[in-house]
Amino acid sequence: MANKREFPLAKTRNIGIMAHIDAGKTTTTERILYYTGKIHKIGETHEGDSQMDWMDEEKERGITITSAATTAQWKDYRINIIDTPGHVDFTIEVERSLRVLDGAVTVLDAQAGVEPQTENVWRQAETYGVPRIVFVNKMDKIGADFDKSVKSLHERLNANAQAVQMPIGSADTFEGVIDLINMVADIYDEDKLGSKWDTVPVPDEYKEEAEKRRAALIEAVADVDDNIMEKYLGGEEISNDELKAAIRKATLNLEFFPVYAGSAFKNKGVQMMLDGVIDYLPSPLDVKPYVAHDPKTGDEVELMADDKKPFAALAFKIATDPFVGRLTFIRVYTGSLESGSYVLNASKNSRERVGRLLQMHANSRTEIPEVFSGDIAGAIGLKNTTTGDSLTDPDHPLILESLQVPDPVIQVSVEPKSKADRDKMDVALQKLTEEDPTFRAETNPETGQTLISGMGELHLDIMVERMRREFNVEAKIGEPQVAYRETFTKEAKAQGKFVRQSGGKGQYGDVWIDFTPNEEGKGYEFEDAIVGGVVPREFIPSVDQGLQEAMKNGVLAGYPLIDVKAKLYDGSYHEVDSSEAAFKVAASLALRNAASKAGAVILEPIMKVQVTTPEEYLGDVMGSITARRGTMEGMEDRAGAKIINSFVPLSEMFGYATTLRSSTQGRGTFTMVFDHYSPTPKSIQADIIKKRGGDAE
């Protein structure tokens, strides 16, 4: 028998808490869990016992790395909360959670207002069309300035943000808030850990200011709501319900962002912000239809939350849980799913069985029999599912748009300290790359080194630390490396002759090969132009193979040789002594002999680099790109920032994240992707050859 849905869709909220690092986001989430009855003791991030920060690294560093999903209940609503990291190296976690959320709470530090990472997460939320409310936190701090924080939302983010509350006092004197819609004051009792407050008429000394601010709020709402505008201009009374309905509509349309005040640490204002989540953020029924694609026809299919429709969900996170093993976090868009059922992984076209379904609370869990549309839950038993995969009813396959995964920007070698560590490291890297698509691991066939790449130095530090702690792997970390290549720039004909006579059967292979540069990206091409059997048919594949093997270690510094055409046009053989092995060696000798005449050069990877910076740092940023041998491709404006497009050699990009951070006071960000290979300048080529101990021709 089908299970009954516990909360109606209209009373469900899927929200994220997003902020700059240290704005008090984890503490805010803690308080939400405390006041909604999910935890009985308040944990503090700075004491290392916060409920949401459940990985050991997070507890030590006091920052949130993994977005933990938690279910809470406020009044008669279910709120699914995803706690997201505020550090720029963990942007994928933020992207992931925004992708599956319906609304978000942006937490600001009342002292700092909008900070660099706030700009980044705000831009990401704009990309995914996520409605937001703002919580100005840390009102108890010296220097807290609510009005300045609201102003920073306008100036830095160009957001139509308006206070729906006014703080009573600040720093030591902060004691509560005035509700500008209902025109009442909520004043907290210091002794009750924020669970008790008195709702009283607005104190006389705040009345005039509160009236002024309410008028400003109505004016801001009138700008985005015709009905309110009409009443406002006509001097008619606007009821509280009308005002709330207009704010909700404008917030859902991304035209308005209500701002709240509070101090999570001092237990003030969190409940009113929770009311804001219910009043102004969307239920799964309020969001735009979700667009999926039919894999058979390619047609677009619109998904609206509906339990009766076929099941469709997105796997948005894989975690290795200490108690249940591999855990897949899913967001259900339509339909329902019982534990024990089979689903189709439409992204990989394979059937999988969902063993158990769990509702998550930071790092504890409750088993549930069924999930419904709009739910966020953990699934156990999905062995082949990875981040971004679509899980659907086996008879109704759909591909839900996958996550935008940025490419890693830093790569280092990692070496196990012992043979025993080697096997454990392979298992650890496989698990960690499954969990995090921006973390990659590969073995370099040229050096045998294992290379790991990620979004920044902190990202890789934490991955190495997790290998040590969770998988007991001790490893040494090397310096960042660049994968160079070699190629020919001129035509060259060369002979390769291999003759060996050492008693008994000898060795004989003789070839003439014409080498020419190939088009970029075309790789190696072999042409057989032998006439009259001067090289017998059976030895020709050996010539091709010999060349391919020789090209793995180039002629200048041992880097792979690429984009070369080889035409075998002459040669000779010996009736008895010729063999496949002899022709293989002859081919490699021809390649070596051609090198000096073929204008061999070392190629370096050139990255397409996009830097986003506030305009005031533009000169410094452009100067820094030029100093790194970069070439400018163009510039554009976006959301109050300048975007610079350029091409820069990868070898010059090491340490750039730190340089950019310091030259833009942490407000600049960049992305880079591999674009093409290009010859290195002569002086740099000589340095590379010297370091590798090769011979410059």
From Swiss-Prot:
GTP binds at residues 19-26, 83-87, 137-140. It holds the Pfam family EFG_IV. One of its GO terms (biological process) is ribosome disassembly. One of its GO terms (molecular function) is GTPase activity. One of its GO terms (cellular component) is cytoplasm. It is found in: Cytoplasm. Residues 10-285 form the tr-type G domain. SUPFAM superfamilies: EF-G C-terminal domain-like, P-loop containing nucleoside triphosphate hydrolases, Ribosomal protein S5 domain 2-like, Translation proteins. This is Elongation factor G. It comes from Lactobacillus acidophilus (strain ATCC 700396 / NCK56 / N2 / NCFM).
